[in-house]
Amino acid sequence: FYDSPHVYDDLIFPDFWSWVCFTIDSLIQSGTDFWIKPHPNQIALSDTVVQLLIKKYPQLKIMSSRITNSQLVEGGMVCGVTAYGTVAHELAYMGVPSICCAKHPHHSFKFCRTAKSLDEYRIFLQNPSFREQSTKEMQRQALAFFYMHNINGGEDIIALRQQFNRYFKLANDSQGDQLAQELIKFR
């Protein structure tokens, strides 16, 4: 909830709170059985937001963020919903499509349906089990996406990504001294 909601263009909501409330309201109205899985790497402040959601929607079913995507798929998950998260290609690799609502890194791939308006997003949510592709094709596209997004680009790009990931983990999980030492490496 404290991430940058407009890091990608065309997010059809002003912020993540509006997105999650619209999503929950639409799924409830359509009678769709769903669960909320908090982001596994969310910052501690987001726990407060989850508690606010539980107060607003007492019937809400929240699962542990420790549940893996593999466990969800093995349990019968038919669709994932994310504003623009990596879960879209992670689920696609396991044969599960997703619904997104911003121009995100996956938008050129057919393993996720990307809504361009609130009405289109609501329609997608009313039919979450719709699949345009076979599991094999979704898996192929997920691998193509992963290569283009994470591997293609050379050693310098990969090293920068790894350094940023280390910084992010320290910024959210450590004491200031370790973070300062890690930041010095960016000089």
Label the predicted regions.
Residues 61-65, 112-124:
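Short acidic-hydrophobic, aromatic-tinged amphipathic segments that line or gate anion-handling sites
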Residues 1-6, 41-48, 69-72, 88-90, ...:
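Flexible loop/turn segments at secondary-structure boundaries
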Residues 118-187:
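C-terminal amphipathic helix plus adjacent low-complexity
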Residues 1-52:
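Conserved catalytic-core segment of nucleotide-activated headgroup transferases in glycan assembly
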Residues 66-113:
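A donor-sugar binding/catalytic signature common to diverse glycosyltransferases
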